Amino acid sequence: MPDALPQAAHYPFRDMHQAHCRRADLGATQLLTAFSTAAPGWAGALMAWRNRLVARFGLKTGPMQQAGTLSLQPGGHIGMFRIMHLGPQLAVLGEDDRHLDFRILLSVSPEAGGSRLQVETWVRPHHWGGWLYLALVLPVHWLLSKLMLRRMAQRLGESGSSGLLR
């Protein structure tokens, strides 16, 4: 297993969302491209506000690349998320910071009638401040991750219909 792939046991917080897409010919690169455009406009404003706030505490704010400047390879960035691994059906984004480390796993797998898209978030807080940060961002994280997955499935499956699995 490549070093960039996280080990689940090291991340005490994990969540996962899935969606079905009628396209069967999808790979991780298409997922990354869809991820890069799936955030609603308000998410960018929220991230800019978050960056101004957490910079005062010495936390990473990351580069905010625009969609036209994406580098879809390990070491590149999508927004403030560093691409840590890119395989045929799995992409791992993430960052390690003082308060916590996180990984976003984007995967696609074939299933009857198309593909299953899956987004997992894994977080390893380092201390109470990391747990506090996680508790504060979780409501927005859950809303945004579900919304982004739905938008990814819609964009990737424009030749057919798609929807969020419940």
Predicted regions and their residues:
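Hydrophobic-ligand binding "helix-grip"
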Residues: 70-112
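A conserved amphipathic terminal alpha-helix motif
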Residues: 132-166
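Beta-strand/loop substructures that line and gate deep hydrophobic ligand-binding cavities in soluble
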Residues: 98-135, 139
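Intrinsic-disorder/low-complexity, polar/charged segments enriched in Ser/Thr/Lys/Arg/Asp/Glu/Gln
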Residues: 12-18, 90, 116-118
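Low-complexity, charge- and small-residue-enriched intrinsically disordered regions
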Residues: 58-68, 142-151
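Short hydrophobic helices that act as membrane-entry/anchoring signals
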Residues: 44-51, 55, 130-138, 145
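Short amphipathic alpha-helical segments with coiled-coil-like heptad repeat character
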Residues: 39-41, 91, 150
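Hydrophobic ligand-binding cavity/cleft-lining segments
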Residues: 1-63
